[in-house]
Swiss-Prot record:
One of its GO terms (molecular function) is translation elongation factor activity. The modification Hypusine is found at residue 36. PANTHER family: TRANSLATION INITIATION FACTOR 5A FAMILY MEMBER. Keywords: Cytoplasm, Hypusine, Initiation factor, Protein biosynthesis. It is found in: Cytoplasm. It comes from the Archaea. GO terms for cellular component: cytoplasm. Functions by promoting the formation of the first peptide bond. HAMAP family: eIF_5A. This is Translation initiation factor 5A. One of its GO terms (biological process) is translational elongation. Belongs to the eIF-5A family.
Length: 127
């Protein structure tokens, strides 16, 4: 598994974090100190990278949390099977995989794209 542990205080907006066994990108991060005898708490709001679900989490800032290592890769569209599915070839390994095309993205065969990959899940990024 491509993930590591970090303290919650080391996170910031735009980072990735594991929430409910899904890789999520942090949209909002805030900390609050509850009082004289309490540790600071962090509130994290994030959106799933591959499923789009919104999730939130509240943890002490010194707690450890899993952070996924999401790879950003370059690929080339080999062919379009339909308007929503395409064959993509990784430009480093020359491996060919089938991916969903986001609805508002208009791509053609032989175009170069950028995509995210984590534990067998892949998503084409919008330009």
């Amino acid at each position: 598994m491509a993930k590591e542990q970090k303290e919650v205080r080391d996170l910031q907006e735009g980072n990735y974090v594991m929430m409910e066994d899904a890789a999520c990108q942090i949209n909002a991060y805030s900390t609050a100190k509850p009082g004289k005898h309490g540790s600071a708490k962090a509130r994290i709001e994030a959106e799933g990278v591959f499923d789009g679900k919104k999730r939130s989490l509240s943890q002490p800032v010194d707690a450890k949390i899993w952070v996924p290592i999401v790879n950003r890769k370059q690929g080339q569209i080999v062919s379009k099977e339909s308007d929503t599915v395409a064959q993509v070839m990784d430009l480093e390994t020359y491996e060919t995989v089938t991916m969903q095309i986001p609805g508002e993205l208009d791509i053609q065969a032989d175009e170069n794209i950028e995509y995210l990959e984590f534990e067998g899940q892949r998503k084409i990024l919008q330009e």
